[in-house]
Amino acid sequence: DPANEDIAYHILDMYRDAGGEHLVHRIMEEKRTAGTTMMTVVHHRETPLRIADGAADVGPVWATEIHHARSLGLPIDEVQPGATLDQRDRINYFICRLKTALHPENAQKFLEFILSSAAQAVYARYGFIPHRA
């Protein structure tokens, strides 16, 4: 749901690239009105569970959520969107230390870790584009 998650704008771009404004309208207006497009607050957690319990047939999620769903034994399949629809190179993650962090030393350690080659290897293993300095 674009009202709750910025990632929805990238998903809408993918729909648009796949089928134009007609597809966006079909999914986000017609099917939403009919109750067959379900909005989410935390799509990457809600969507795999909806698929597993039969409330949904398909939905966009992070690659890590496919892994997580499988680790829980959920019967879920993965479909890659393909290079022309892939949005990974357009998405940014922001990690920062709060000025009022209760444990600023731990925040700093996490920031140092997330920039490390070990952490970047984890990102790459799950199909994410590693951090660019």
Task: Tell me the role of every PLM-derived stretch.
Residues 1-133:
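Exported/periplasmic ABC-transporter solute-binding proteins
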